[in-house]
Amino acid sequence: MLDQLTIDSFEPLVGSSFWLLWNGHKVELRLTRAARVMESEAARLKRTAFSLFFLAPLFIPQGIHHLTHDALPEPLDIFLVPVEKQGDAYTVEAVFT
């Protein structure tokens, strides 16, 4: 499913909640932004690269994480990277190429 998702799949979800299972607890990640990274330069790329930015209430370490959202037909296993601390929250990013 991941290879079929585009930025258009996520733009309507900006501002909504995704859920991550972390240490036995359900953690809310709010999608704050969906942004195009660059135009596809080669025909081998099936989509334009994009990033998703989430706001998390706690530090999420870099790695593959299992996320769910009510609007998506199945859970996503995506690689998240912490990029910034904002007060008591953290911004994490997922890049799709």
Language model features: what each stretch is:
Residues 31-33, 80:
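Conserved hydrophobic positions within beta-strands
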Residues 21-30, 69-76:
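Short coil-to-beta-strand transition motifs
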Residues 35-40, 84-88:
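Short, conserved beta-turn/loop elements at beta-strand boundaries and strand-helix junctions
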Residues 64-97:
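Short, compact, well-ordered microdomains
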Residues 14-16, 25-27, 46-50, 61-63, ...:
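A generic structural signal for short beta-strands and their flanking turns/coil linkers
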Residues 1-7:
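Mixed-charge, Lys/Arg-rich low-complexity intrinsically disordered regions
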